[in-house]
Curated annotation (Swiss-Prot):
Localization annotation: Cell membrane
Cellular component terms (Gene Ontology): plasma membrane
Purpose of the protein: Na(+)/H(+) antiporter that extrudes sodium in exchange for external protons. Can also transport lithium.
Gene responsible for this protein: nhaG
Native species: Bacillus atrophaeus
Protein name stated in the entry: Na(+)/H(+) antiporter NhaG
Length: 524
Protein backbone atom coordinates (compact mmCIF):
# COMPACT_ATOMS: atom_id res chain seq x y z
CA UNK A 1 0.00 0.00 0.00
CA UNK A 2 2.95 2.37 0.56
CA UNK A 3 3.56 2.89 -3.16
CA UNK A 4 0.09 4.31 -3.82
CA UNK A 5 -0.02 8.10 -4.15
CA UNK A 6 -3.17 10.20 -3.71
CA UNK A 7 -3.73 10.44 -7.46
CA UNK A 8 -3.64 6.65 -7.82
CA UNK A 9 -5.95 6.23 -4.82
CA UNK A 10 -8.43 8.64 -6.42
CA UNK A 11 -8.30 6.71 -9.69
CA UNK A 12 -8.95 3.41 -7.90
CA UNK A 13 -11.76 4.96 -5.87
CA UNK A 14 -13.39 6.39 -8.98
CA UNK A 15 -13.09 3.01 -10.70
CA UNK A 16 -14.87 1.37 -7.75
CA UNK A 17 -17.66 3.96 -7.97
CA UNK A 18 -18.14 3.28 -11.71
CA UNK A 19 -18.33 -0.49 -11.19
CA UNK A 20 -20.73 -0.14 -8.25
CA UNK A 21 -22.94 2.34 -10.12
CA UNK A 22 -23.11 0.10 -13.18
CA UNK A 23 -24.08 -3.00 -11.20
CA UNK A 24 -26.62 -1.01 -9.16
CA UNK A 25 -28.21 0.41 -12.32
CA UNK A 26 -28.52 -3.04 -13.92
CA UNK A 27 -29.97 -4.56 -10.74
CA UNK A 28 -32.53 -1.77 -10.38
CA UNK A 29 -33.50 -2.07 -14.05
CA UNK A 30 -34.05 -5.81 -13.54
CA UNK A 31 -35.98 -5.06 -10.31
CA UNK A 32 -33.59 -7.08 -8.18
CA UNK A 33 -32.15 -6.03 -4.79
CA UNK A 34 -28.95 -4.24 -5.74
CA UNK A 35 -26.99 -5.03 -2.52
CA UNK A 36 -27.15 -8.76 -3.24
CA UNK A 37 -26.10 -8.24 -6.87
CA UNK A 38 -23.13 -6.16 -5.71
CA UNK A 39 -22.00 -8.79 -3.19
CA UNK A 40 -22.22 -11.56 -5.80
CA UNK A 41 -20.33 -9.56 -8.46
CA UNK A 42 -17.77 -8.43 -5.88
CA UNK A 43 -17.21 -12.05 -4.86
CA UNK A 44 -16.76 -13.10 -8.50
CA UNK A 45 -14.27 -10.27 -9.14
CA UNK A 46 -12.41 -11.30 -6.00
CA UNK A 47 -12.19 -14.96 -7.01
CA UNK A 48 -11.27 -14.49 -10.69
CA UNK A 49 -7.78 -13.27 -11.57
CA UNK A 50 -8.27 -10.22 -13.81
CA UNK A 51 -5.07 -8.12 -14.18
CA UNK A 52 -7.07 -4.90 -14.55
CA UNK A 53 -8.76 -5.46 -11.18
CA UNK A 54 -5.76 -6.67 -9.16
CA UNK A 55 -4.62 -3.21 -7.88
CA UNK A 56 -8.25 -2.45 -7.05
CA UNK A 57 -8.68 -5.70 -5.08
CA UNK A 58 -5.42 -5.14 -3.22
CA UNK A 59 -6.44 -1.60 -2.30
CA UNK A 60 -9.97 -2.42 -1.11
CA UNK A 61 -9.18 -5.59 0.80
CA UNK A 62 -6.42 -3.95 2.80
CA UNK A 63 -7.84 -4.17 6.33
CA UNK A 64 -7.26 -0.58 7.43
CA UNK A 65 -8.74 0.86 4.23
CA UNK A 66 -11.86 -1.30 4.47
CA UNK A 67 -12.33 -0.53 8.16
CA UNK A 68 -11.89 3.23 7.66
CA UNK A 69 -14.21 3.41 4.66
CA UNK A 70 -17.00 1.36 6.27
CA UNK A 71 -16.95 2.59 9.87
CA UNK A 72 -15.64 6.15 9.70
CA UNK A 73 -16.68 7.28 6.23
CA UNK A 74 -19.93 5.47 5.41
CA UNK A 75 -21.49 4.31 8.69
CA UNK A 76 -22.36 7.82 9.99
CA UNK A 77 -23.86 8.70 6.59
CA UNK A 78 -25.97 5.53 6.35
CA UNK A 79 -27.21 5.71 9.94
CA UNK A 80 -27.87 9.44 9.68
CA UNK A 81 -29.79 9.10 6.43
CA UNK A 82 -32.02 6.34 7.82
CA UNK A 83 -32.76 8.13 11.10
CA UNK A 84 -33.20 11.53 9.43
CA UNK A 85 -36.18 10.31 7.39
CA UNK A 86 -37.76 8.17 10.11
CA UNK A 87 -40.74 10.10 11.53
CA UNK A 88 -40.60 10.05 15.31
CA UNK A 89 -44.37 9.56 15.37
CA UNK A 90 -43.95 6.29 13.43
CA UNK A 91 -41.25 5.16 15.83
CA UNK A 92 -43.43 6.04 18.81
CA UNK A 93 -46.39 4.12 17.36
CA UNK A 94 -44.18 1.04 16.94
CA UNK A 95 -42.04 1.46 20.04
CA UNK A 96 -43.11 -1.80 21.67
CA UNK A 97 -41.92 -4.18 18.92
CA UNK A 98 -38.79 -2.07 18.31
CA UNK A 99 -37.86 -2.07 22.01
CA UNK A 100 -38.73 -5.76 22.29
CA UNK A 101 -36.37 -6.56 19.41
CA UNK A 102 -33.71 -4.38 21.07
CA UNK A 103 -33.98 -6.75 24.04
CA UNK A 104 -33.94 -9.65 21.61
CA UNK A 105 -30.47 -8.55 20.50
CA UNK A 106 -29.19 -9.40 24.00
CA UNK A 107 -30.89 -12.81 23.80
CA UNK A 108 -29.19 -13.50 20.47
CA UNK A 109 -25.85 -12.30 21.86
CA UNK A 110 -25.99 -14.69 24.82
CA UNK A 111 -27.14 -17.69 22.77
CA UNK A 112 -24.45 -17.24 20.10
CA UNK A 113 -21.78 -16.54 22.73
CA UNK A 114 -22.39 -19.61 24.89
CA UNK A 115 -23.07 -21.88 21.90
CA UNK A 116 -19.80 -20.81 20.27
CA UNK A 117 -17.96 -21.67 23.49
CA UNK A 118 -19.55 -25.08 24.00
CA UNK A 119 -20.10 -26.31 20.45
CA UNK A 120 -17.32 -24.61 18.46
CA UNK A 121 -14.80 -24.57 21.33
CA UNK A 122 -13.95 -20.90 20.95
CA UNK A 123 -12.26 -19.12 23.84
CA UNK A 124 -14.56 -16.89 25.91
CA UNK A 125 -13.46 -13.54 24.37
CA UNK A 126 -13.57 -14.93 20.82
CA UNK A 127 -16.99 -16.52 21.38
CA UNK A 128 -18.60 -13.32 22.62
CA UNK A 129 -16.86 -11.12 20.04
CA UNK A 130 -18.37 -13.38 17.38
CA UNK A 131 -21.74 -13.12 19.16
CA UNK A 132 -21.53 -9.31 19.13
CA UNK A 133 -20.69 -9.30 15.42
CA UNK A 134 -23.78 -11.39 14.73
CA UNK A 135 -26.02 -9.00 16.69
CA UNK A 136 -25.89 -6.28 14.03
CA UNK A 137 -28.41 -6.42 11.18
CA UNK A 138 -28.33 -4.77 7.76
CA UNK A 139 -31.84 -3.98 6.49
CA UNK A 140 -30.94 -2.35 3.15
CA UNK A 141 -31.64 -5.41 0.98
CA UNK A 142 -34.77 -6.35 2.93
CA UNK A 143 -36.26 -2.85 2.83
CA UNK A 144 -35.70 -2.57 -0.92
CA UNK A 145 -37.53 -5.88 -1.37
CA UNK A 146 -40.31 -4.75 0.98
CA UNK A 147 -40.82 -1.70 -1.21
CA UNK A 148 -40.91 -3.70 -4.44
CA UNK A 149 -43.55 -6.16 -3.20
CA UNK A 150 -45.72 -3.65 -1.32
CA UNK A 151 -45.06 -4.87 2.23
CA UNK A 152 -46.90 -2.98 5.02
CA UNK A 153 -45.28 0.30 6.06
CA UNK A 154 -45.44 -0.66 9.75
CA UNK A 155 -43.35 -3.77 9.11
CA UNK A 156 -40.70 -1.70 7.32
CA UNK A 157 -40.56 0.76 10.23
CA UNK A 158 -40.10 -2.05 12.77
CA UNK A 159 -37.28 -3.62 10.71
CA UNK A 160 -35.54 -0.27 10.20
CA UNK A 161 -36.03 0.78 13.82
CA UNK A 162 -34.59 -2.51 15.07
CA UNK A 163 -31.53 -2.14 12.86
CA UNK A 164 -30.82 1.45 13.90
CA UNK A 165 -30.74 0.61 17.58
CA UNK A 166 -29.27 -2.88 17.58
CA UNK A 167 -26.33 -1.70 15.46
CA UNK A 168 -25.45 0.63 18.31
CA UNK A 169 -25.89 -2.15 20.85
CA UNK A 170 -23.79 -4.54 18.75
CA UNK A 171 -20.86 -2.10 18.65
CA UNK A 172 -21.04 -1.61 22.43
CA UNK A 173 -21.13 -5.39 23.04
CA UNK A 174 -18.25 -5.87 20.59
CA UNK A 175 -15.99 -3.37 22.37
CA UNK A 176 -16.77 -4.80 25.81
CA UNK A 177 -16.23 -8.39 24.63
CA UNK A 178 -13.01 -7.64 22.75
CA UNK A 179 -11.25 -5.39 25.24
CA UNK A 180 -12.79 -5.70 28.72
CA UNK A 181 -14.55 -9.05 29.12
CA UNK A 182 -11.66 -11.10 30.54
CA UNK A 183 -10.78 -8.34 33.01
CA UNK A 184 -14.37 -8.23 34.24
CA UNK A 185 -14.51 -12.03 34.55
CA UNK A 186 -11.30 -12.06 36.61
CA UNK A 187 -12.84 -9.53 39.02
CA UNK A 188 -15.92 -11.69 39.65
CA UNK A 189 -18.94 -9.87 41.11
CA UNK A 190 -17.10 -6.56 41.03
CA UNK A 191 -16.31 -7.14 37.37
CA UNK A 192 -19.98 -7.77 36.61
CA UNK A 193 -20.79 -4.40 38.17
CA UNK A 194 -18.04 -2.69 36.20
CA UNK A 195 -19.23 -4.33 32.99
CA UNK A 196 -22.79 -3.17 33.59
CA UNK A 197 -21.55 0.34 34.38
CA UNK A 198 -19.47 0.43 31.17
CA UNK A 199 -22.47 -0.77 29.18
CA UNK A 200 -24.80 1.88 30.64
CA UNK A 201 -22.14 4.62 30.41
CA UNK A 202 -21.35 4.03 26.74
CA UNK A 203 -25.02 4.01 25.72
CA UNK A 204 -26.05 6.93 27.98
CA UNK A 205 -23.16 9.12 26.89
CA UNK A 206 -23.98 8.38 23.26
CA UNK A 207 -27.60 9.39 23.87
CA UNK A 208 -26.52 12.62 25.57
CA UNK A 209 -23.97 13.64 22.91
CA UNK A 210 -26.37 12.87 20.07
CA UNK A 211 -29.23 14.61 21.85
CA UNK A 212 -27.27 17.79 22.58
CA UNK A 213 -25.79 18.10 19.09
CA UNK A 214 -29.14 17.27 17.46
CA UNK A 215 -30.82 20.02 19.49
CA UNK A 216 -28.07 22.60 18.81
CA UNK A 217 -28.08 22.02 15.05
CA UNK A 218 -31.89 22.03 15.01
CA UNK A 219 -31.82 25.48 16.62
CA UNK A 220 -29.33 26.63 13.97
CA UNK A 221 -31.85 25.92 11.21
CA UNK A 222 -34.17 28.63 12.61
CA UNK A 223 -31.69 31.32 11.59
CA UNK A 224 -31.21 30.24 7.98
CA UNK A 225 -33.45 29.47 5.02
CA UNK A 226 -30.66 28.25 2.78
CA UNK A 227 -30.84 24.56 1.91
CA UNK A 228 -27.23 24.16 0.63
CA UNK A 229 -26.00 25.51 3.97
CA UNK A 230 -28.42 23.34 5.94
CA UNK A 231 -27.26 20.27 4.01
CA UNK A 232 -23.73 21.13 5.18
CA UNK A 233 -25.11 21.41 8.73
CA UNK A 234 -26.48 17.87 8.45
CA UNK A 235 -23.10 16.54 7.23
CA UNK A 236 -21.28 18.22 10.11
CA UNK A 237 -23.90 16.94 12.57
CA UNK A 238 -23.68 13.28 11.53
CA UNK A 239 -19.89 13.10 11.50
CA UNK A 240 -19.24 15.30 14.53
CA UNK A 241 -21.69 13.34 16.69
CA UNK A 242 -20.05 10.06 15.63
CA UNK A 243 -16.45 11.23 16.05
CA UNK A 244 -17.06 13.14 19.28
CA UNK A 245 -18.84 10.18 20.86
CA UNK A 246 -16.04 7.80 19.83
CA UNK A 247 -13.43 10.19 21.27
CA UNK A 248 -15.40 10.34 24.54
CA UNK A 249 -15.56 6.55 24.79
CA UNK A 250 -19.28 6.51 23.98
CA UNK A 251 -21.29 4.83 21.24
CA UNK A 252 -20.84 6.78 18.02
CA UNK A 253 -23.59 4.76 16.37
CA UNK A 254 -26.18 5.67 19.02
CA UNK A 255 -25.04 9.32 18.97
CA UNK A 256 -25.58 9.58 15.19
CA UNK A 257 -28.99 7.90 15.33
CA UNK A 258 -30.26 10.17 18.11
CA UNK A 259 -28.81 13.33 16.52
CA UNK A 260 -30.35 12.52 13.14
CA UNK A 261 -33.74 11.63 14.65
CA UNK A 262 -33.87 15.00 16.44
CA UNK A 263 -32.62 16.95 13.42
CA UNK A 264 -35.04 15.24 11.03
CA UNK A 265 -38.07 15.69 13.27
CA UNK A 266 -37.60 18.58 15.72
CA UNK A 267 -35.24 20.53 13.44
CA UNK A 268 -37.52 20.08 10.44
CA UNK A 269 -40.48 21.28 12.49
CA UNK A 270 -38.95 24.45 13.94
CA UNK A 271 -36.52 25.61 11.27
CA UNK A 272 -36.81 23.93 7.88
CA UNK A 273 -39.01 25.02 5.03
CA UNK A 274 -40.55 22.21 2.97
CA UNK A 275 -38.08 23.06 0.19
CA UNK A 276 -35.12 22.66 2.55
CA UNK A 277 -36.39 19.39 3.97
CA UNK A 278 -36.97 17.98 0.47
CA UNK A 279 -33.47 18.96 -0.68
CA UNK A 280 -31.80 17.58 2.46
CA UNK A 281 -33.64 14.27 2.01
CA UNK A 282 -32.72 14.17 -1.69
CA UNK A 283 -29.06 14.82 -0.89
CA UNK A 284 -28.91 12.00 1.64
CA UNK A 285 -30.81 9.68 -0.73
CA UNK A 286 -27.94 10.10 -3.20
CA UNK A 287 -25.28 9.77 -0.48
CA UNK A 288 -26.88 6.60 0.92
CA UNK A 289 -27.22 4.99 -2.52
CA UNK A 290 -23.57 5.72 -3.29
CA UNK A 291 -22.41 4.50 0.12
CA UNK A 292 -24.49 1.32 0.01
CA UNK A 293 -23.36 0.52 -3.53
CA UNK A 294 -19.69 0.83 -2.58
CA UNK A 295 -20.13 -0.97 0.75
CA UNK A 296 -21.73 -4.10 -0.70
CA UNK A 297 -19.25 -4.31 -3.58
CA UNK A 298 -16.41 -4.03 -1.05
CA UNK A 299 -18.00 -6.70 1.15
CA UNK A 300 -18.11 -9.06 -1.84
CA UNK A 301 -14.42 -8.43 -2.56
CA UNK A 302 -13.47 -8.78 1.11
CA UNK A 303 -15.31 -12.08 1.53
CA UNK A 304 -12.99 -13.76 -0.98
CA UNK A 305 -10.11 -13.39 1.49
CA UNK A 306 -11.41 -16.10 3.82
CA UNK A 307 -9.73 -19.48 3.88
CA UNK A 308 -12.25 -22.22 4.67
CA UNK A 309 -9.69 -25.02 4.49
CA UNK A 310 -10.56 -27.62 7.18
CA UNK A 311 -13.21 -25.27 8.60
CA UNK A 312 -16.25 -26.05 6.46
CA UNK A 313 -17.96 -27.97 9.25
CA UNK A 314 -17.44 -25.25 11.83
CA UNK A 315 -18.50 -22.55 9.36
CA UNK A 316 -21.79 -24.38 8.72
CA UNK A 317 -22.24 -24.83 12.47
CA UNK A 318 -21.70 -21.08 12.94
CA UNK A 319 -24.42 -20.34 10.38
CA UNK A 320 -26.84 -22.74 12.09
CA UNK A 321 -26.12 -21.27 15.55
CA UNK A 322 -26.73 -17.72 14.31
CA UNK A 323 -30.00 -18.73 12.61
CA UNK A 324 -31.26 -20.49 15.76
CA UNK A 325 -30.24 -17.55 17.96
CA UNK A 326 -32.01 -15.10 15.64
CA UNK A 327 -35.18 -17.20 15.71
CA UNK A 328 -35.12 -17.43 19.51
CA UNK A 329 -34.50 -13.68 19.83
CA UNK A 330 -37.37 -12.72 17.51
CA UNK A 331 -40.01 -15.17 18.73
CA UNK A 332 -39.23 -14.73 22.45
CA UNK A 333 -39.00 -10.93 22.35
CA UNK A 334 -42.18 -10.51 20.27
CA UNK A 335 -44.19 -13.18 22.10
CA UNK A 336 -45.89 -10.63 24.35
CA UNK A 337 -46.61 -8.01 21.68
CA UNK A 338 -50.34 -8.17 21.00
CA UNK A 339 -51.76 -7.95 17.47
CA UNK A 340 -48.37 -8.54 15.87
CA UNK A 341 -48.99 -10.94 12.95
CA UNK A 342 -47.06 -14.21 13.08
CA UNK A 343 -46.23 -13.78 9.38
CA UNK A 344 -44.42 -10.56 10.29
CA UNK A 345 -42.42 -12.44 12.92
CA UNK A 346 -41.34 -14.97 10.31
CA UNK A 347 -40.35 -12.11 7.98
CA UNK A 348 -38.34 -10.26 10.65
CA UNK A 349 -36.63 -13.51 11.63
CA UNK A 350 -35.49 -14.44 8.12
CA UNK A 351 -34.88 -10.80 7.18
CA UNK A 352 -32.25 -10.25 9.89
CA UNK A 353 -29.41 -10.10 7.38
CA UNK A 354 -25.81 -9.51 8.42
CA UNK A 355 -23.71 -7.07 6.42
CA UNK A 356 -20.94 -4.53 6.23
CA UNK A 357 -20.85 -3.53 9.92
CA UNK A 358 -20.09 -7.11 10.99
CA UNK A 359 -17.24 -7.33 8.46
CA UNK A 360 -15.79 -3.94 9.40
CA UNK A 361 -15.86 -4.71 13.12
CA UNK A 362 -14.14 -8.07 12.77
CA UNK A 363 -11.41 -6.51 10.62
CA UNK A 364 -10.83 -3.91 13.35
CA UNK A 365 -9.73 -6.63 15.81
CA UNK A 366 -6.03 -6.44 16.71
CA UNK A 367 -3.99 -8.93 14.68
CA UNK A 368 -2.80 -10.65 17.87
CA UNK A 369 -6.34 -11.09 19.24
CA UNK A 370 -6.77 -14.77 20.28
CA UNK A 371 -8.92 -16.63 17.75
CA UNK A 372 -9.04 -13.71 15.28
CA UNK A 373 -8.64 -15.90 12.19
CA UNK A 374 -11.41 -18.26 13.31
CA UNK A 375 -13.73 -15.32 13.99
CA UNK A 376 -12.95 -13.92 10.53
CA UNK A 377 -13.85 -17.20 8.85
CA UNK A 378 -17.09 -17.65 10.80
CA UNK A 379 -18.21 -14.02 10.45
CA UNK A 380 -17.52 -13.92 6.71
CA UNK A 381 -19.32 -17.26 6.21
CA UNK A 382 -22.43 -16.06 8.03
CA UNK A 383 -22.46 -12.72 6.17
CA UNK A 384 -22.12 -14.42 2.77
CA UNK A 385 -24.87 -16.94 3.58
CA UNK A 386 -27.05 -14.17 4.96
CA UNK A 387 -26.77 -11.78 2.02
CA UNK A 388 -26.97 -14.37 -0.74
CA UNK A 389 -29.20 -17.18 0.56
CA UNK A 390 -31.48 -15.22 2.88
CA UNK A 391 -31.40 -12.16 0.64
CA UNK A 392 -32.49 -14.10 -2.44
CA UNK A 393 -35.20 -16.08 -0.62
CA UNK A 394 -36.84 -13.27 1.36
CA UNK A 395 -39.02 -12.20 -1.59
CA UNK A 396 -40.47 -15.71 -2.21
CA UNK A 397 -41.03 -15.99 1.55
CA UNK A 398 -43.00 -12.71 1.58
CA UNK A 399 -45.15 -13.94 -1.29
CA UNK A 400 -45.76 -17.31 0.35
CA UNK A 401 -46.67 -15.71 3.69
CA UNK A 402 -48.94 -13.18 2.00
CA UNK A 403 -47.08 -10.27 3.58
CA UNK A 404 -47.00 -8.53 0.21
CA UNK A 405 -50.77 -8.38 -0.18
CA UNK A 406 -51.77 -5.32 -2.17
CA UNK A 407 -54.46 -2.82 -1.30
CA UNK A 408 -58.03 -4.08 -1.50
CA UNK A 409 -59.46 -3.66 -4.98
CA UNK A 410 -56.03 -3.11 -6.49
CA UNK A 411 -56.06 -6.29 -8.57
CA UNK A 412 -59.47 -5.47 -10.05
CA UNK A 413 -58.39 -1.89 -10.74
CA UNK A 414 -55.25 -3.04 -12.56
CA UNK A 415 -57.32 -5.38 -14.74
CA UNK A 416 -59.70 -2.54 -15.68
CA UNK A 417 -56.73 -0.27 -16.33
CA UNK A 418 -55.10 -2.85 -18.61
CA UNK A 419 -58.32 -3.40 -20.59
CA UNK A 420 -58.88 0.34 -20.93
CA UNK A 421 -55.33 0.97 -22.12
CA UNK A 422 -55.66 -1.91 -24.58
CA UNK A 423 -58.87 -0.48 -26.05
CA UNK A 424 -57.55 3.11 -26.25
CA UNK A 425 -54.52 1.78 -28.13
CA UNK A 426 -56.82 -0.16 -30.47
CA UNK A 427 -58.85 2.99 -31.25
CA UNK A 428 -55.68 4.93 -32.11
CA UNK A 429 -54.44 2.07 -34.28
CA UNK A 430 -57.74 1.91 -36.21
CA UNK A 431 -57.53 5.64 -36.92
CA UNK A 432 -53.89 5.31 -38.03
CA UNK A 433 -54.59 2.34 -40.31
CA UNK A 434 -57.63 4.12 -41.80
CA UNK A 435 -55.48 7.14 -42.61
CA UNK A 436 -52.54 5.16 -44.06
CA UNK A 437 -54.49 2.56 -46.03
CA UNK A 438 -57.44 4.78 -46.97
CA UNK A 439 -59.99 2.43 -45.40
CA UNK A 440 -63.56 3.70 -45.74
CA UNK A 441 -65.07 5.63 -42.82
CA UNK A 442 -68.06 3.28 -42.61
CA UNK A 443 -65.79 0.31 -41.95
CA UNK A 444 -63.53 2.00 -39.41
CA UNK A 445 -66.29 3.83 -37.53
CA UNK A 446 -68.16 0.61 -36.82
CA UNK A 447 -65.12 -0.89 -35.11
CA UNK A 448 -64.25 2.38 -33.37
CA UNK A 449 -67.78 2.73 -31.99
CA UNK A 450 -67.62 -0.81 -30.64
CA UNK A 451 -64.33 -0.07 -28.85
CA UNK A 452 -65.64 3.24 -27.48
CA UNK A 453 -68.71 1.49 -26.10
CA UNK A 454 -66.47 -0.99 -24.26
CA UNK A 455 -64.34 1.90 -22.92
CA UNK A 456 -67.50 3.59 -21.62
CA UNK A 457 -68.48 0.40 -19.79
CA UNK A 458 -65.03 0.20 -18.26
CA UNK A 459 -65.34 3.79 -17.03
CA UNK A 460 -68.61 2.90 -15.29
CA UNK A 461 -67.02 -0.15 -13.66
CA UNK A 462 -64.05 1.95 -12.54
CA UNK A 463 -66.34 4.58 -10.97
CA UNK A 464 -68.14 1.86 -9.01
CA UNK A 465 -64.79 0.48 -7.87
CA UNK A 466 -63.73 3.95 -6.69
CA UNK A 467 -66.96 4.22 -4.68
CA UNK A 468 -66.20 0.90 -3.00
CA UNK A 469 -62.49 1.63 -2.46
CA UNK A 470 -62.05 5.43 -2.28
CA UNK A 471 -58.36 5.03 -1.37
CA UNK A 472 -57.71 3.82 -4.92
CA UNK A 473 -59.14 7.05 -6.32
CA UNK A 474 -57.15 9.12 -3.82
CA UNK A 475 -53.97 7.36 -4.89
CA UNK A 476 -54.63 8.15 -8.56
CA UNK A 477 -55.43 11.78 -7.73
CA UNK A 478 -52.16 12.06 -5.83
CA UNK A 479 -50.18 10.74 -8.80
CA UNK A 480 -52.00 13.14 -11.13
CA UNK A 481 -51.45 16.13 -8.83
CA UNK A 482 -47.77 15.31 -8.47
CA UNK A 483 -47.22 15.13 -12.23
CA UNK A 484 -49.16 18.35 -12.76
CA UNK A 485 -46.99 20.09 -10.15
CA UNK A 486 -43.84 18.85 -11.90
CA UNK A 487 -45.21 20.28 -15.16
CA UNK A 488 -45.95 23.60 -13.43
CA UNK A 489 -42.39 23.72 -12.08
CA UNK A 490 -40.99 23.16 -15.58
CA UNK A 491 -43.34 25.79 -17.03
CA UNK A 492 -41.98 28.40 -14.58
CA UNK A 493 -38.44 27.29 -15.45
CA UNK A 494 -39.18 27.88 -19.15
CA UNK A 495 -40.60 31.37 -18.48
CA UNK A 496 -37.50 32.28 -16.49
CA UNK A 497 -35.15 30.91 -19.17
CA UNK A 498 -36.90 33.02 -21.84
CA UNK A 499 -36.61 36.12 -19.58
CA UNK A 500 -40.39 36.51 -19.54
CA UNK A 501 -40.33 36.60 -15.72
CA UNK A 502 -37.50 37.56 -13.35
CA UNK A 503 -35.40 35.02 -11.45
CA UNK A 504 -36.85 36.30 -8.17
CA UNK A 505 -40.43 35.62 -9.26
CA UNK A 506 -39.44 32.23 -10.70
CA UNK A 507 -37.74 31.16 -7.45
CA UNK A 508 -40.75 32.30 -5.42
CA UNK A 509 -43.22 30.37 -7.57
CA UNK A 510 -41.02 27.27 -7.71
CA UNK A 511 -40.65 27.30 -3.93
CA UNK A 512 -44.45 27.36 -3.62
CA UNK A 513 -44.73 24.41 -6.01
CA UNK A 514 -42.12 22.42 -4.06
CA UNK A 515 -44.00 23.16 -0.83
CA UNK A 516 -47.14 21.67 -2.40
CA UNK A 517 -45.20 18.58 -3.54
CA UNK A 518 -43.80 18.07 -0.04
CA UNK A 519 -47.25 18.45 1.53
CA UNK A 520 -48.60 15.93 -0.96
CA UNK A 521 -45.87 13.44 -0.01
CA UNK A 522 -46.43 13.97 3.71
CA UNK A 523 -50.18 13.44 3.37
CA UNK A 524 -49.64 10.13 1.59
Amino acid sequence: MEHLDLHHIFELGFFVVMIAAGITAIAKKCRQPYPIALVIVGTIIGLVHIPLFEPLKEFITEGEVFNFVIITLFLPALLGEAALKLPFSHLRENKRPVLALFGGTLISFLIVGFSSMWLMHLAIPAAFVFAALMSATDPVSVLSIFKSVGAPKKLSIVVEGESLFNDGLAVVLFNISAFYLMTYLDLGIQGAGLGLWEFVKVISLGLIIGGVLGYVFSQLTKYFDDYPLEIIFSIILFYSSFLLAEMAGASGVIAVVVAALIFGNYGAKIGMSPTTKLNINNFWDVAALLANSLVFLMVGLEITRIDLTDKWGLAIMAIVIVLIARSAAVYISLAFIKKFPVTWKHTINWGGLKGSLSIALVLSLPRDFPGREDILVFAFSVVLFSLVVQGLTIKPLLERLGVNQKEEGNQEYEELLAKGHRLETAIKEVQQVKHNLLIHEAVSSELTDQYKKEVSQLHQQTNKLFETYPELKNKQQTILKKHSLYAQYQAIENLSREDIISNEVAELEQARIIDEIVRLQNDH
